[in-house]
Amino acid sequence: MGTEWDGEADVVVVGASVAGFCTAVNAAELGASTILLESADEVGGTGRKAAAWAWIPGNHLMQEKGIPDSREDAMAYLARFARPAMYDPEHPTLGLPAWEHELLEAFVDNGPAAMKTLVDIGALSVMHADDYPNYYSHHAIDKVPFGRVVIPQLPDGEPGDGIEFTRRMEAAARERGVDIRTSHPVEGVLTNEAGEVVGVTAADDRRFRARRGVVFCTGGFSHNDGLRDQYLSGLLVPGCSVPTNQGVLVDVSRRLGAPLIHMNAAFMSPIQYEWVLRGDPEIVGLFQTPGDSMIIVNKHGRRIGNEKTSYNDRSIPHLTFDVERAEYGNLLSFALWDERTNTTWAGAPYGFVPAADGDRSLVVEGATLEALADALDARLESLGSRNRGIRLEPGFLTGLAEQIARFNAMAIAGVDEDFRRGDAAIDRFFHGERIDNPYPNPTMHPMSGSGPYYASIIAPSAIETKGGPRATPGGGILGPDDEPIPGLYGVGNCVASATGQAYLSGGITFGPYITFGLLAARAVVAAPVKEVRATELA
């Protein structure tokens, strides 16, 4: 009896978001029949919700403008911040593990061509975000602080976002005959007697044959509570990625004996904690911190860090372990602002200040600081066991008053002596336009001495995890013998990241997805056909 398949193609791509679309479109462009399976009922994944900025050193728009960006400068920037404790500029791999260095080299060497390919084949229209700084542009090692970001362009010439990226890439895929099937969650892979991957299984006993290979582009495991607790110690809540990011490739890798790497790392962002508790799939992270007359404090009323730095680095202070108290005392912290910020920054995107007519259920209000503290502690109490053991300390109000007095003095002077808020270009970029602030530092304005005051509960979240099996530059997933498993590939957050602990810039996810999507497509299209018999799949 012959094998019955629900679909058969040269290439099966799993996951119809950024990495998946880039892989599928390139594979089809190279002449391969391609099936694209998506677990949700619509395509786009987390990429649909994103700004869709792609960070690509030496991109073609930089070249057209004559902006120099050497391979050496790009590699130094990547290596220095990905692995700060290991970085060695004199070492052949800059101090990085060889496989990470190889991946970063492949990204730098192929990124410009990968982006230009999508443009040349008509899959995307893009424009240059040449005013967008790298997140560590204030460090001397960053020789090219601006110009590496490329963004989608709408038909009217305006900047696009993840919705536009998804629209264009879906159209490009369909134009090339890619068979897109939504509501097809993949559960595992099929192998032949030689151990080669020859297809996948999906829900409802559906099976799909991949003659040359299967490419997983399924995202990380940020919404898998068990995996997140196991590998991230329960510290990070699920972020703004789509709920279908359940770590399916983790399970596949375990079954095939593929080692898992960097499972304790994540791309992070602060997030409004009570929004997380609602399980709203439309949730977004706090990618910007609105306001100048605002601070973020812990349960002692003390600031925890620079409120204006990048979202990943704003998450790090939340994870500080208090040795004396043996606790993560900043795990829930509190954005606190006055009426100036509440009015002037109302409805600012990616922030916590609601629009004047917006939903205020995530905001606690008080006519005085005393009233605000009482209301905030009552809100924490109402969360019960979900408050992560955090209540306001008895000295919160005293600490807060002292903190506001110190912040106000620094705002008048224009220098944040504690956390250098406003010093870096990225602080000022995320702050946005200077709004009616007469003080020297545009990111700081004294908080009002009278109410009302407002607060929101903030937690650190995993935008997406960075761990998984190791992959070659061509996406081949390495098995227990450190050799690629024939027929199995991975691109994106489902495989181990080479960027270590860092979030180097906006677009550091899209840029590599676009690059490695092309490289994986080339590799799988060139791979030999894997033979399979019905008896081997029984």
Enumerate the predicted regions with their spans:
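Conserved redox-cofactor binding core of oxidoreductases
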Residues: 96-205, 225-226, 273-274, 404-447
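Core beta-strand elements of the Rossmann-like FAD/NAD(P) dinucleotide-binding domain
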Residues: 6-9, 203-213, 484
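N-terminal Rossmann-like FAD-binding beta1-loop-alpha1 element of flavoenzymes
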Residues: 11-36
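Extreme N-terminal leader/targeting segments of oxidoreductases
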Residues: 1-11, 29, 499, 503, ...
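Glycine-rich FAD pyrophosphate-binding loop
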Residues: 29-50
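A glycine-rich dinucleotide-binding beta-alpha-beta segment and adjacent secondary-structure elements
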Residues: 188, 389-498, 502
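Glycine-rich loop(s) and the adjacent beta-strand/alpha-helix scaffold that form part
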Residues: 208-277, 283, 510, 516-519
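An anion/pyrophosphate-binding glycine-rich loop and adjacent beta-alpha core
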Residues: 250-252, 259-395
